[in-house]
Every structure is written in structure tokens, then in C-alpha cells.
Regions:
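Core RecA-like ATPase module of SF1/SF2 helicases and allied nucleic-acid translocases
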Residues: 48-49, 56-60, 68, 194-351
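Walker A (P-loop) phosphate-binding loop of P-loop NTPases
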Residues: 6
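Conserved lysine of the Walker
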Residues: 9
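Conserved Walker A/P-loop ATP-binding site and its immediately adjacent core
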Residues: 25-45
Length: 351
């Protein structure tokens, strides 16, 4: 599934995992965005405890709920992607380029599993999975494998392929959002399903994979076998729910960062009532924000987590706040201090 930033891809993935879990079926939502996973796990664990306490008070259950029990329940269907990957790297060996279980390993390690429990695995921001070279480097440096022959997409698909009955892999993909070293993009997922052992899989993809931000517009051409290929336009989310009144904003930002000057200029002309200014002066940016913030409005500054050169102007992008406390603490708690939340001196960063 593809979609513009803020269109609701993550929401669809989460809702699918939660609905499947509630129905007694096994599904897991996986994300490489650690703060997101931590906040979600904590929020759902608190909700679980609150609901179970209500059931206990009403006499519907005799079991007192615990936070530990709630966390275990939630982690069954919302996990960090790298922890899921590492779990299925346990107890395997590479034989002639193929993954095989180590003889006797899973008999002596009953807390481990070779075959995933879940039938549905949902990978959010799937374009950020690692290339073969990056995963090989990482596993070699950590002493796990000397020469691992799989990319992260190929390995994750191979995990679900171990199922004897059925399995579904859902990839939520943002176009052109491979932002860190070694991130594979949609190309690596396609190369994975091109492997002969996966030719029995049905592949459902968005028709927007032919757009330029997905493997340079050649994603559909990269697929070798079209016998089980199903192209569905409904697998693309085209409207941003974050800014539904300004759908062109995401388009403008994409064009600006891609240095598409003519296209960006045309799009900006449509956004006449949307406040967009461009400057290289931090002081001017702060001044503009203060002048245009009205009433109870709050302003802030967003900085890239990789922009360490900003340290020269006292912007510490390495700062790691307590995400759970920031997002989930009740606003009426006395210990929460929001006095500085309207002063553009602290910086958020997006990983």
C-alpha cells in the first residue's frame, strides 16, 4: 500500500493488527519508528489495564489486571521491526545460500520459534528496510553471520514463507522516504519476490508504483512474473489526513526537497493562503514565528536528527526526550510544565 505522507497508512496497519488480534487471529504490526512503538505500546497497555479494572469492579472477572500482563498482551501484536527480525535470526544457519534451522536448536530452546506465530505481518515504512549489504555489514559486526546472503525484505518474507498453511505480508510504503544509509526502498522488496521460491505468492500492489518516487518509476517493470500480479488503484491513499485542507502542501515540500524549482513554484502559487516562507536565518525564522503566533496557538521548530552541524548554533538534535511522558501524561497533572512550549528554543527531530 502506498500513500502520501499523513494519508493514514500507519492507521490502517495498526487497525488491521488490532482487529485481527481482537478476533482471535494472529497478526503483528512492525515499525522501525521506535518512539511510535513505545508510545503505542504504553497507551494500549494503559487502556487494557483500565478496561480490565472496570470488568473486575463489575464482577465480570476475578483476576486483577497487572501492567506487566498488559504489556505482554500488547507486545504480541505491536513490535519494533528489528526485534522481530532478530527473533527469527535465532537458531538458523545458512546452507548453500538457504536458511535452515540448526539441528536440535528449537527442541532445546522451547522459548524460541523457527516458524512465526502470526499469519499476518504488517511492515510500516517498509521502504526503510535494509539492503543486503547493510544487513550483512550489521550482522558481521555483531558476530551473528560472517556473510549473510539476504536483504532485510528478503529475510522477512522468508520468515512468513516458513508457514505451512498461509501467510500475508503487508508493506506500507511512503514514496521517496528512504532517508538513512542502507535503506532499500521498494526495489529491494520487488527483487525479493522475484526469487524463484516465492513465485507461488500472489502479489497485490498499488498502481502508483509507476510514479517516479518509487524505484525511479520502474517498480512495475522490475517484477519478473505477472501471472500472480494484481494491480489495485485502491491500494494508494492520495489525500493527507494531517492537512486535508491543504493537500498541495506535501506535494510542494516534496518538489522543494527534490530541487524541482519550476514545479515547486507552480504549486506554491496555489497555496496563496497557506503560510509558507523560506529562510536560511534561524533568527529570522524565530522572529517570524513570534509575530504570527496568535492567542492560544503554539509554535515550534523541527530539525533533522541527522543535522549535527546545527550544534554550532546551539541546536542539539541528539536530545532524546521521554516520548511516553510527552505524549501520554494527562494535561491536568501539576508536574507538567508547558510554559516554554510556545518558545521556539527546543527542537523536535524526526528519525
Amino acid at each position: 500500500m502506498t500513500g502520501v505522507p499523513g494519508a493514514g497508512k500507519t492507521l490502517i496497519g495498526l487497525q488491521t493488527a488490532i482487529d485481527e488480534h481482537a478476533a482471535g487471529r494472529s497478526a503483528v504490526y512492525l515499525s522501525g519508528n521506535d518512539p511510535l512503538v513505545e508510545v503505542l505500546q504504553e497507551a494500549l497497555a494503559r487502556d487494557y489495564v483500565a478496561r480490565k479494572k472496570e470488568e473486575f469492579r463489575e464482577g465480570k472477572t476475578t483476576e486483577r489486571p497487572t501492567k506487566k500482563q498488559a504489556q505482554s498482551e500488547v507486545k504480541a501484536f505491536i513490535q519494533k521491526a528489528y526485534l522481530y527480525r532478530n527473533a527469527y535470526l535465532e537458531g538458523i544457519q545458512i546452507v548453500n545460500g538457504k536458511i535452515k534451522p540448526k539441528p536440535g536448536y528449537f527442541y532445546s530452546h522451547t522459548d524460541k520459534a523457527y516458524v512465526p506465530v502470526e499469519n499476518v505481518a504488517i511492515f510500516d515504512e517498509a521502504q526503510r528496510a535494509w539492503t543486503k549489504d547493510e544487513l550483512r555489514r550489521f550482522l558481521k559486526e555483531n558476530g551473528r553471520f560472517e556473510d549473510f546472503p539476504y536483504s532485510e525484505p528478503a529475510f522477512l518474507i522468508s520468515c512468513m514463507d516458513r508457514k505451512k498453511d498461509w501467510g500475508v505480508v503487508i508493506c506500507l510504503v511512503g514514496g521517496g522516504q528512504e532517508i538513512n544509509k542502507g535503506e532499500a526502498g521498494i526495489r529491494e522488496w520487488i527483487e525479493a519476490i522475484n526469487q524463484e521460491q516465492y513465485h507461488g505468492w500472489d502479489v497485490y500492489i498499488s498502481d502508483r508504483l509507476q510514479d517516479r518516487e518509487y524505484a525511479d518509476g520502474k517498480a512495475l517493470e522490475l517484477i519478473n512474473s505477472t501471472e500472480r500480479l494484481h494491480v489495485r488503484p485502491e491500494l494508494h491513499l492520495s489525500v493527507s489526513m494531517r492537512s486535508f485542507r491543504a493537500e498541495k502542501v506535501s506535494q510542494f515540500v516534496h518538489q522543494l526537497l527534490a530541487m524541482q524549482q519550476d514545479e515547486a513554484r507552480k504549486t506554491l502559487q496555489v497555496l496563496t493562503k497557506y503560510p509558507i516562507v523560506l529562510t536560511r536565518s534561524l533568527d529570522k525564522a524565530k522572529e517570524w514565528l513570534r509575530e504570527h503566533t496568535r492567542g492560544s496557538e503554539r509554535c515550534g521548530i523541527l530539525a533533522s536528527s541527522k543535522a549535527e552541524r546545527l550544534k554550532a548554533i546551539s541546536i542539539n538534535v541528539r536530545y532524546k526526550p521521554n516520548f511516553i511522558h510527552w505524549f501520554l501524561a494527562p494535561v491536568d497533572q501539576e508536574e507538567i510544565d508547558i510554559r516554554s512550549s510556545n518558545a521556539p528554543e527546543g527542537y523536535s527531530n524526526r528519525i
